[in-house]
Amino acid sequence: MLSVQQLRVNGRRDDLLPPTSLQASRGELLLVTADRQDQRTALALALSGRMKPGGGTVSWDGQTKIRQLRVAGALVDSPGVNEPEQHLSVRDLVTEDLSLIPRRYRGALLSKPWLKVNRFEDIAGMWAEQLPPRRRTELLTALALANPRTDLLVLDSPDRHSGDPADWLPRLRDLAYDGGRPLAVVAAVTALPPGWTGPAAVVGNAAPKAAITEEQPEIEDAK
């Protein structure tokens, strides 16, 4: 289980990520909303162990060491961090990502057979920028799961590629609820999809009410 209490990330002046609490179990998809891209990215980085928190705690299966979080967690498609470079072909992207898997788990993974087994041959010759949103989400999550130690998927703004939740929500739900390999899946999004009744949280939900009130005018001015 991913358990987060009063997590915050320091910014240059104010908190980049205001105090936020949440939890996500294996077999569960949690959607976390934040208006600002920098807040969504800071959350995704902290939840996957790629950024040191300024305060609060993040634990995975009761372990608070950031190394445990990095081993279990995979950061997916974070803007300016690990989103695919637009000039890469899907085939090259797959080759590059598979090479990052620890050698003891990688075995003889090669891009061509991997693309075939995972049913991505139809997009192998495309550039990353040409990928339809749904196939992009399917591809990048499949690559994250090529590492057998991945138990936690953290997606940064999957809704930025399409206004239609059908392009990303069903895929994430299927991954979370997969009985063969139940995952904890967390997606930082702009807003909850219409009709969403599953687990949800809001960035800043653990901040003192007075602090939230003071910051509202600044957020509005920045839009």
Which residues does each predicted region cover?
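Conserved beta-strand
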Residues: 4-7, 15-25, 56
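Short hydrophobic beta-strand immediately N-terminal to the Walker A/P-loop
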Residues: 30-33
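ABC ATPase nucleotide-binding domain signature region
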Residues: 35-100
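ABC-family P-loop ATPase nucleotide-binding domains
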Residues: 79-139
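GG-anchored amphipathic helix commonly corresponding to the ABC/SMC/Rad50 NBD signature/C-loop
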Residues: 133-155
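Conserved catalytic loops of ABC-family nucleotide-binding domains
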Residues: 149-151, 160-195
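A short helix-turn-beta junction within AAA+ P-loop NTPase domains corresponding to the substrate/partner-engaging
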Residues: 196-219
